[in-house]
Amino acid sequence: LEPGQFTPWEDIPTGTDVLFYEGLHGGVKGEGYDVAALADLLVGVVPITNLEWIQKIHRDNAERGYSAEAIVDTILRRMPDYINHICPQFSQTDINFQRVPTVDTSNPFICRNIPTPDESFVIIHFRKGAREKWGIDFGYLLNMIHDSFMSSPTSIVVNGGKMGFAMELILTPIIHRMIEEKNKLS
């Protein structure tokens, strides 16, 4: 598919335990549609804005050959959609993983390198009620993820290199529970 194209709709086979969707619009909500309401679990994975722009600039230049000026024009042109359609989805998610660099990214338009996971923290935020709904034990997570800490009653911070491990610790039991509950209903 070309950038900006959607994959075609497909039927989900009977007996499917889990449908995993990855993309920009998993929690989109608007006039006449509410994709967020169809999901049992919404997980957001998003870098802080300047990091997102650095990644876009590097990717679009390396993979598509776009000039820095053309990429900045694209970012500016898409800003209303970003503000009105992308960002609000993260208010719908149960859990957000947000990567925040610990190196200077104050001007994303001149950054030479994309900060590595080890040059970042990941803020893991749980929407109000999500910890209780999914049985998330902050004490367990803090014990299991070295150097993690709570930054608020609803957020844990981990080293960027530990994001995959944190996702595994958090999401695996949730998915198992979802399948168990589905099996009880059938």
Positions of the model-derived regions?
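Short His-Asn-centered micro-motif
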Residues: 21-24, 45-46, 99
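Inter-motif core of Ras-like GTPase G domains
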Residues: 34-46
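C-terminal accessory "lid"/substrate-recognition subdomains
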Residues: 12-14, 18, 35, 49-186
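Phosphate-binding/switch loop-helix module in NTP-utilizing enzymes
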Residues: 1-30
